[in-house]
């Protein structure tokens, strides 16, 4: 008979992969139609002129142009000029 119970395997060691969120095009960069500007959870950054908002709150370009960010007291907006 064993004098010690056999050691079980660890139940730790799992973690989810990163979601690759964040700003993809910064202010002053050139965006083509359909290019992703921001990947986010919720609307931390809100869409303004010439940008669209996807189902998963992704902000993307509706027209070609220069990406521009604007901030008021509480919110941040992104547009294409």
Curated annotation (Swiss-Prot):
One of its GO terms (cellular component) is ribosome. Signal peptide: none annotated. It comes from the Eukaryota. One of its GO terms (molecular function) is structural constituent of ribosome. One of its GO terms (biological process) is translation. Keywords: Mitochondrion, Ribonucleoprotein, Ribosomal protein. Belongs to the bacterial ribosomal protein bL27 family. This is Large ribosomal subunit protein bL27m. It comes from Reclinomonas americana. The lineage of its organism: Eukaryota, Discoba, Jakobida, Histionina, Histionidae. The gene is RPL27.
